[in-house]
A protein has these predicted regions:
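Residue-level hotspots at or immediately adjacent to binding/recognition sites across diverse folds
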Residues: 24-344
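Bacterial Sec-dependent N-terminal signal peptides
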Residues: 1-27
Length: 344
């Protein structure tokens, strides 16, 4: 009898905890704003260390979960747009300047000084995004040059970069390119497995093994996929569960074909029953079922793997990222605006 009572009590307690957790609602809490920079680069190292990068050569860093921020203008790059950043700890980070010329810089002293590790003055060069797996292997992509998608990689933590040979680069269609919107149109995993989404007149998914069409809205330079999220259970191998978002940034309230999800690696794509509430520049898995997406007219949350999206904030953001090690989720956007997702 005593054993049965304990089992029943334990089951009731577990049910109460589950009901409490399901009742929690995500809320966007703005932490800081007012800086004259558009933030598109965001790297959340852990629950305390966050780096951001943006226009006017600006980089920001917090080491106390976003309570206070240190702002730095990179010396000699006052007008450069750093649209992506990858940070590894409170001292080490890499920033990507889009072009022309294109730059990649690295700091090892918390942003006090920066070393130029890559420069490309090729006409038409425009870097769009980069992604790292661990602290050594990384990949950067850029708009097509002579119809060949630009790709370079590093195996030493960004100290040196090796460009892919032209004959190994994927061929882009006329009017097909990438959006330097949030640094999340590329996802990299172990064994150099990658996922890249394009936009413009044609929108496709490029992987290390295939190229497939995307059903997202496309056909003009303002349309197409902006971001891809690939679910990973922690082994850094990725999975077949993916979500793609985008739309038309010239019609930021349009919900027409702005989001699709797949559970078979992109062989088939499904449209959400309730799509995000407009153009979205970034999407991020929070866990297997919960996702966050943001754009010019607000933030959406999905708790069923991307099948339905709830508009939880009308605050504008370019990018949202979850901590590499931890559970904290941050967002960044125009006018130096940075926010944190909290559960109420």
């Amino acid at each position: 009898m005593n054993s049965l009572f304990k089992k029943v009590t334990s089951s009731i307690f577990f049910l109460i905890i589950m009901l409490w957790a399901s009742a929690q609602q995500p809320e966007v809490q703005v932490l800081t704003s007012g800086t004259k920079t558009s933030l598109r680069g965001l790297s959340v190292v852990n629950d305390n260390i966050i780096w951001v990068s943006g226009s006017r050569g600006m980089v920001g860093k917090s080491t106390n979960a976003g309570k206070t921020w240190k702002w730095m203008k990179v010396n000699g790059f006052d007008t450069t747009e750093f649209r992506d950043i990858e940070a590894f700890d409170g001292n080490t980070a890499i920033i990507m300047g889009v072009g022309e010329p294109a730059y990649i810089l690295k700091t090892s002293d918390g942003g006090d000084s920066w070393k130029l590790v890559y420069e490309n003055k090729t006409k038409g060069m425009f870097l769009d995004a980069m992604h790292f797996i661990g602290s050594n292997m990384g990949m950067v992509i850029g708009d097509p040059i002579d119809k060949k998608i630009y790709i370079a990689e590093t195996m030493d933590g960004g100290d040196t970069w090796k460009e892919w040979p032209v004959d190994k680069r994927p061929v882009a269609d006329s009017g097909e390119a990438f959006f330097a919107a949030s640094g999340t149109n590329i996802r990299l995993f172990r064994d150099k497995k990658f996922y890249i989404v394009s936009g413009g007149t044609r929108s496709r998914l490029f992987t290390s093994s295939a190229i497939t069409e995307l059903p997202i809205v496309q056909g003009t330079e303002s349309t197409g996929a902006n971001s891809i999220a690939v679910y990973d259970d922690g082994d850094l191998k990725g999975s077949k569960r993916m979500v793609v978002v985008g739309g038309d940034f010239s019609a930021d309230s349009s919900r027409v074909k702005n989001c699709f999800y797949t559970s078979d690696g992109g062989k088939t794509w499904k449209k959400p029953a309730t799509p995000p509430h407009g153009y979205r520049s970034c999407v991020e898995y929070l866990d297997k079922n919960n996702l966050l997406s943001c754009g010019l007219n607000g933030v959406d949350h999905s708790k069923d793997g991307g099948k339905n999206w709830e508009w939880i904030s009308k605050e504008s953001f370019h990018v949202c990222r979850i901590a590499k090690s931890g559970v904290a989720i941050f967002l960044a956007g125009n006018n130096g605006k940075i926010a944190k997702l909290v559960w109420k």
